[in-house]
């Protein structure tokens, strides 16, 4: 499916001030960037602009500031340094976003140089999409580029605001994300196997519904599986469950059956007597979960069942872990799925969030066809929803 918005290729950026909303929301501990995936993902757009003599002004959020001013642990300064290191470019940083210092730093940017502004969320008006914020940011540029796919589903000041005042186009990452995630559902090579995990049915209901409409096989794991067990009349002990969603889960099972879509649920589970890293796993069948145990991961027989389905696939979409993969004792299921997807002869799309963390944890990122940088944005796109950030851009 062709991208329907203008991109940086479609505009003249030579000598222009190009304001770029990137997604540099990366993990930082003690001033050190832990995962550079999102920084690297922004490089094609940044490099293109530098090569075409643009004056590049980058803005992003980092973490969840209170919006009451500077918080040192959430400053983008370490990210700016990491960007310079990864790109080899001349990157400046200004510890300001909307004030005089920022305006002066923007005015000093020369063609082919890069400036990183401070965290846009240090001001609470950013989240409210305050027009004053939008106007201020727009005053820094001649052109606006949105390349932050991870925040494209949020109608916030730095995401949609400048598009009201400047010619607004997409960066290469945004274009690729939208193309890939919409394309996989428009014309997937079959068999198309979708894998959905995570804790709650309620948070993935739209995604599950959409996948039943497009996939050949839907694999379900993680905490949400126990709500489906309840819909089948099984007992789940102390496992995570959403009583209010049992009926809806049952309706989805019925819908899948009517459409000829195969739904695979765990046939065995790793359970424990408490939730914790020190919990000792026991393997039990799905119809024999003890009342005093809670499910923490899929079991070994389920791993084989799921891996076999993945092996036959030509297209795989995966979002959400199979268990509490942060605990080593309960990471087996997620690792088994990650390895199966990596080994399969298929187009593999990893749909953001915890699945990306899992793929990175098991060092399998380079074996996947596409790893999305968006969590919520990926899911909303998969559900068929319009993303406010994309909607605000100029039509091609």
Summary of predicted features, one role per range:
Residues 1-396:
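Active-site loop-to-helix "anion-binding N-cap" substructures in soluble metabolic enzymes
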